[in-house]
């Protein structure tokens, strides 16, 4: 009889708790937290990384580089590193790019992206994701981990495509929150879904992703979830911006806008909805007129 997989969860926030909920009954879990409390038996990276079969990075993207560099010499050659981070770090890189640069060349890694609201996972509801990896072996491992749960996963080789799909959806989700706060109506919400997906698809292709990737779980699926859920942080950010509130406008979406601008990752002139959102995040004033100007720009009225 084979021993159960040893899984190391990095980060014990919302998604760390969700992964713990899904995996705790069948696997040996160790959980590492950078700022541990005294009421949980957290592990240390030094002791746990060397024994892990899977390392789940349930962390924001910014700490990925430091943590990956620290554990890289400790990992077994077969250990699979998986990230759920949906953002860009301070150098403008995705989690996949950080893994590729900082893990050993042959170290397997994957990205897990899709509509996975932590609160719903922890109440036993269904969730869905794409696992992006360079081969199907990583998918087989993760599918085995989740096949007794209500987290349903499918495989894709398009790591670049799902990375940018899930990063950009946080930007576009804010527009839905703005529109809802301004009570622009259901027709506008339908239009925004089409316009956002159109631009998202163009940007993903420009970044090297495949044409159809934005129309799957990491793109359209996660966009709709984030853009329409009242519990969504980025939907609420959009509402705050529409109210012309400037305080605490933070999150992966605003940070993505900042990194794309700072590192010149994208020619934003081609994407008017993206440009409008960026302008509002920078200066949340006259949001309703900016929507009107945007609609006129699109239809040349």
Task: Give the residues covered by each predicted segment.
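NAD(P)+-binding Rossmann beta1-loop-alpha1 motif at the extreme N-terminus of oxidoreductases
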Residues: 1-51, 70
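NAD(P)-dependent Rossmann-like dehydrogenase/reductase catalytic/cofactor-binding core
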Residues: 4, 176-177, 205-301
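Conserved active-site and cofactor/substrate-binding residues in soluble primary-metabolism enzymes
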Residues: 10, 14, 18, 62, ...
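Rossmann-like NAD(P)(H) cofactor-binding subdomain of soluble oxidoreductases
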Residues: 12, 16-19, 45-125, 142
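Short gly/ser/thr-rich secondary-structure transition/capping motifs
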Residues: 37-43, 111-112, 155-156
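Alpha-helix C-terminal capping/helix-to-coil transition sites in glycosyltransferase folds
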Residues: 50-51, 168, 220
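Internal alpha-helical scaffold of NAD(P)-dependent oxidoreductase catalytic cores
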Residues: 63, 74, 98-108, 126-213
């Amino acid at each position: 009889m084979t021993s159960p997989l040893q899984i190391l969860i990095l980060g014990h926030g919302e998604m760390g708790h969700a992964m713990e909920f899904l995996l705790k009954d069948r696997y040996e879990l160790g959980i590492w937290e950078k700022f541990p409390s005294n009421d949980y038996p957290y592990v240390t990276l030094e002791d746990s990384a060397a024994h892990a079969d899977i390392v789940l990075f349930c962390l924001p993207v910014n700490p990925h580089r430091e943590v990956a560099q620290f554990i890289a010499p400790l990992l077994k050659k077969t250990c699979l590193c998986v990230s759920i981070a949906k953002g860009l770090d301070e150098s403008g890189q995705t989690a996949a790019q950080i893994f590729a640069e900082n893990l050993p060349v042959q170290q397997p890694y994957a990205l897990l992206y899709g509509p996975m609201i932590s609160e719903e996972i922890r109440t036993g509801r269904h969730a869905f994701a794409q696992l992006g990896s360079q081969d199907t072996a990583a998918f087989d491992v993760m599918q085995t981990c989740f096949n007794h749960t209500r987290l349903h996963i499918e495989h894709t080789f398009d790591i670049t495509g799902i990375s940018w799909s899930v990063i950009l959806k946080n930007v576009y989700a804010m527009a839905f929150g703005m529109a809802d706060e301004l009570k622009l109506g259901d027709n506008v919400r339908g239009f925004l879904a089409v316009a956002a997906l159109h631009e998202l698809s163009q940007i993903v292709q420009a970044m090297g992703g495949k044409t159809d990737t934005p129309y799957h779980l990491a793109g359209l699926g996660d966009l709709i979830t984030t853009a329409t859920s009242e519990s969504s942080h980025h939907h609420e950010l959009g509402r705050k911006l529409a109210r012309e509130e400037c305080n605490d406008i933070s999150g992966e979406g605003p940070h993505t806008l900042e990194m794309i601008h700072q590192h010149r990752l994208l020619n934003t002139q081609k994407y008017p909805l993206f440009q409008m959102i960026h302008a509002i995040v920078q200066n949340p004033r006259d949001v309703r007129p900016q929507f009107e100007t945007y609609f006129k720009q699109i239809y040349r009225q």
